[in-house]
């Protein structure tokens, strides 16, 4: 598949199948026990008055299988387990039989389980006869169980339903392979943060279809945009991404707040080493943008090129520039970090020369990760996941490595098959072979702000964007990523400013 050539050496993969989720920032897992109990009792009472059949809740609760799109990294697995406990606690407060709750990362027999489709056969075989709904949610999705039951009751469970909060592209975009170019707004796809549901008849149909028609695309780029010939998404207003404390939340079955996680003090500036991939032909137009925007946020930054220029300065790694891939350059950066940087520097970030990034926010995010674990963090894509492939971090949005991950990688002797091999994909293949899962964070972005639905970005505090073409990159940086935004505006004001641009 052709890949669009990126700046300092990364590529943007045009999508045939189109990513999901998840790093998932901080959100309180539960309300105080007494408040939660009172709220549930009130909702149950209201529901009983409406239907006159209190037993209906029991039956329907047992018919829902909750699937949390979790990850195996210790930070994420704990968040998913907290959500699982919250779901079960709500069910227990109702005094009913506990529902089934599944965590994606525990389904380790499926390397591509996060893409959901490989699990359809198992869902159909295990739950096709005794369940009505598969409900998917992210680690930070918050669920009002009674309200969810009330919402699903509106839909005939014997029919094929695909339910969620609808997103759409206002303009055709490369991350969705310019799908529906004439009018991209016609295709609606779910915001995973709000949760989404498939009725069992649709699950069974998909399982049968995938048996006879295996996935045709090698690449998984934006899972929430994947599409087929089945039922279109039915928008459900009760599936929300409003904050728990919002006045709108009272009407919501689900809520979500993707605030930046704070797990302690932000990591120190000196704990992050930033490597910028560039080449001589971009020294004059791209490097000045870096210096006008995020460079001052980084205490340790070096520019790696095919030409040493003291005025920047750039470092020639002895790897010739290539027209595609840049794997040789990336592995040379990894070697240099391990052998020449201070052994006390726990984190390495590799970005392209046209990546816009907030080091300020990254420092907060990394407070949630243990640098003693092998961490490989960024925006997740997939290659050949239906046929034994692997996941990888797409380079344009930034690739974050713990020192431990780099040590294990280089000790394995896994390497580029050529200097111009796609670096991000080779890294994904190497880490997969080592049994080290990549960690996905939706706050890293391979494309520009305009390439994502406004409503999707509205519940994010982004860490990076990529590409300078057809935008003013300095303006985009100060609109979306500059540190002063946290100091000057509330999240609500940020959202209003962004929507007005």
Across the structure, where does each feature detected by a protein language model lie?
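Secretory-pathway lumenal glyco-enzymes, predominantly type II signal-anchor Golgi glycosyltransferases
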Residues: 2-501
